[in-house]
Amino acid sequence: MSLFDERIPYKPFEYPEYYTEGWLKQAQAFWLHTEIPMSGDVKDWNEKLTIPEKNLVGNILLGFAQTECAVSDYWTQKVVSWFPKHEIQQMAMMFGSQETIHAVAYSYLNETLGLENFEAFLQDDATMKRFNNLVSYEGTYKVGIGKSLAVFSAFAEGVSLYSAFAVLYSFQLRNLLKGVGQQMKWSVRDESLHSKMGCKLFRHMCEEDDKLLDDCREDIIAAATTMLKAEENYIDKMFESGDVEGIKAYDLKQFIRKRLNEKLQELGYFDLGGYFKFEEAAASRLDWFYHLTGGHTHTDFFAVRPTDYSKANEGEDFEDIW
């Protein structure tokens, strides 16, 4: 039995965890942008946000929609073609489908707030380099596939959007942009699951090929270093007008460094937990992000509160709550 051996019959599943922990959990968490009330956000945008804050939020949201399209393509085209197992392919197609929901939802946020220049972020150097870093890793053989999958799952799904997620969600601490904040919460939950299962799939590859972890090591470290530089440049770009109330650029950089270390360990490189130096106190000032989005570390969005991973709105009327 191998991940790369084609199986024609639908069942029995050889790797059932990709159905139960991946496809099923994502299916149970289906949501749409139409469930998110935005009237309060429009009022906040027009009456309460400063010009620098509007520029910050606008630049982030415009980039999100395009990025999610690339992420969706990775799951539905690359992962599906590499692993000829129904349970893995179904999970990948479900994840890719969810990314299209993200893209539509971000587009909805953009249009609701009057942000419709979707090509603007493609002309921005710092943002474009970050975008290219997400989609530039490819592979057509086991080592190449392993490197690509690890980089994509750990860093594209598990790190690259989190600085922007945190910035947007910080407005929630000020009782602003609650619709945007709700979408960030659901998106973080989805991305956390995608990253977790992609990292699991890479570790599964390493279990079946005991040389793979070492063969991929240097390239994965190099990719993590590249990702760090891109993220820090992106953070500088976001904060070019100064720190935002409730969050500082320096703290966010430490938060990202800590996440990179955690993701390296999640891939199986347990000796790299301290590879990127960071200030613990500064990184910990972002702990509110995990608490508000439903988890307490980068891996336990579902383990701590498993009932959270079900139908997204759970019958709540968010207009009544807010």
Which residues does each predicted region cover?
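Non-heme di-metal
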Residues: 1-322
